[in-house]
Amino acid sequence: MIEVQKVSLQIKKAKILENVDFTCQKGQICGVVGRNGSGKTMLMKCICGFVKPTSGEIQVDGQVIGKDIDFIPNAGIIIETPGFIPNYSGYKNLQLLASIQNKIDKTRIREVMQMVGLDPDMKRSVKKYSLGMRQRLGLAQAIMEDPSVLVLDEPFNGLDKEGVVEMRQYLLQLKDAGKAIMVCSH
């Protein structure tokens, strides 16, 4: 669950967020919609603990973000454009992520890739992936560790109609599995 309570963010003299308040329960998809530059991405970064709000409090699964330095939210994250090693295949990118976390599970990597509609046996490098395939791989990265919360900034960015429909289906499956999902979009 994500709880945002009276969160404000000011950078220098610019008010980025002012008194933001909402809750996103498990098994729920919540949306943040706004124009470019309206603070959507900064809100997502605050929820993930990358940026400390000027005031207010954010909790993920009952833990206050930023209070306990050892607490890292159990969150899968896509912030704007997912990062990949372009010369590696999608499978190899996920394998590298798993090795960094000391949790290499080849079965899980294959399962996650298939879940988002990618072929784990495809040898093509990520630099040759379409934008839609990269977005799917970004979602695969976000769900690798089976997080309780997903924070997705512009997950439909650059997708065609079919890609948007497929991404929505993946998100509905994750919602039905009890994930709290924050989606930011225009």
Roles of regions detected by a PLM:
Residues 33-35:
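The feature captures the beta-strand-to-loop junction immediately N-terminal to the Walker
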Residues 48:
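Helix-to-loop junction immediately C-terminal to a conserved catalytic motif
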Residues 56-71:
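Conserved ABC transporter NBD signature motif
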Residues 95, 106-121:
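Conserved ABC ATPase "signature" region
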Residues 150-154:
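Catalytic Walker B motif of ABC-type/P-loop ATPase nucleotide-binding domains
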Residues 161-163:
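Helix N-cap at the start of a conserved alpha-helix in ABC-type nucleotide-binding domains
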